[in-house]
C-alpha cells in the first residue's frame, strides 16, 4: 500500500476528493400496463411485478 511521504493539507485533500463525480443513472424503456416508461434498469423487474409505482419516474 502506498504511504504518503508528507502530510497533505486539508484543502488539497478536499480538492483531490472532489474530482469524483456521480454518473447519471442509465434509464431503460419498459412497457408497463400499455404505457412506455423510462426507469432505472435495477427497478425493471420490480416495476413489472407491481412492487414499485411507475408514476414517480
Swiss-Prot record:
MF annotations from Gene Ontology: structural constituent of ribosome
Keywords: Ribonucleoprotein, Ribosomal protein
GO annotation terms (biological process): translation
SUPFAM superfamilies (alphabetical): Zn-binding ribosomal proteins (SSF57829)
Signal peptide: none
One annotated Gene Ontology cellular component of this protein: large ribosomal subunit
Disulfide bonds: none
Pfam families per UniProt: Ribosomal_L32p
InterPro entries with a match to the protein in the record: Ribosomal_bL32, Ribosomal_zn-bd
Family the UniProt entry places it in: Belongs to the bacterial ribosomal protein bL32 family.
HAMAP family xrefs: Ribosomal_bL32 (MF_00340)
Protein name according to UniProt: Large ribosomal subunit protein bL32
Organism in which the protein naturally occurs: Corynebacterium diphtheriae (strain ATCC 700971 / NCTC 13129 / Biotype gravis)
